[in-house]
Amino acid sequence: MIERICHIDKELEDSIFLFGARQTGKSTFLRQKFPDSIYIDLLDTTIKGRFSRRPSLLYEMLSNKEVGTLVIIDEIPEVPELLNEVHRLMSEKGLVFILCGSSARKLKRKGYNTLGGRAYPVYLFPFVSAEIPDFDLQQAINYGMLPPHYLAKNPHRRLSAYIDVYLKEEIKEEALVRNLNTFQRFLEVAALTDGEVINNNNIAQDCGVSANTVGNYFDILEDTLLGFRVPAYTKTMKRRLVQAPRFYYFDIGVANHLLHRKELVRGTAEYGHAFEHLVIQELRAWLSYKESTEQLSYWRAYTGQEVDAVIGDARVAIEIKSVEEILPRHLKGLKTFASDYPESKLLIVSLDPINRKMGDIECVYILDFFKRLWSEGI
């Protein structure tokens, strides 16, 4: 059994929304961590049907339970009308809920009761390196870190099914877009720009839609947890900076599949993009799991110098290179950044196995970086 890092107290006092993309392992995680809870699975069509027809059945079922009883409702967005009953049970009976879902969009879109701030959000991500005893970097770069894909003998088939199910159940059945074929084309174009600065106009031309529609498509990807934007760090008075965010799919395996990448080879541009994506993916999960208030951003000057990851208010700047030997030319972006933010801690993460300092810049092998990240932080 792989132990997940996502921290939810065994003695839970406050209710939570547990969000995570499909197949991140939410149900398995909750069943293992809270085996004695009352568990309601709304993916069971019979159970879903009964609660859909009569949401008050939940109150009747639970109103005689003791104060502090833990109730898990899996895939609450399937029957969001239950949230009124949940709110009532929390207020009147003192029950504690974990409300699980792979998309917050259904709740936002229809204006359902989100419990008035009485349940705080927690996110479960794909595997991170520290959760896997014999972490395989190449496996992660090729197929991503979703549990069924990383552990599978035939991940290609599973990745294909993943995208098909996403389009059918998250997009088509919820009528989130008018033209499913256009949206599918957008998914592929978005994969081509994975890790790049978003340009809605260029993507709109490639997809044959308006720039506003492209912006809405990106919102759908974020709300259904299939992707995320990384904002630009722009706090400076010294130079002109790029303002637009970058976009990443939530898991590198999904991006690879959309781009029809198979076995990635070190030294290629494709490998470099995937390598960077994996590090960004790991940093995002780390910040969330440690409940940090610091933001993940990137920095890019109009003159071309850039830094792939900035943590917090320029506390740490990280360049990510899939090279096997760090050379002075790889440090240009960090040096330019340091001239504007001299107090920043500077790191370059790479495949170079020799950890060392080059001036003020620390060179760290990727696996050592991951170990440090989860053991002592950065």
Predicted regions, residues:
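Conserved lysine of the Walker
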Residues: 26-27
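Domain-level recognition of nuclease-like catalytic cores that cleave nucleotide substrates
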Residues: 353-378
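Short regulatory helix/loop adjacent to the ATP-binding pocket of P-loop NTPases
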Residues: 105-120
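Accessory nucleic acid-recognition modules appended to NTPase machines
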Residues: 158-315, 322
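Pre-Walker A adenine-sensing motif
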Residues: 1-11
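Structural recognition of the conserved hydrophobic beta-strand(s) that form the central parallel beta-sheet
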Residues: 72, 96-102
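Short glycine-rich substrate-engagement loop in P-loop NTPases that contacts/grips substrate
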Residues: 40-70
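Hydrophobic anchor at the beta1->P-loop junction of P-loop NTPases
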Residues: 18
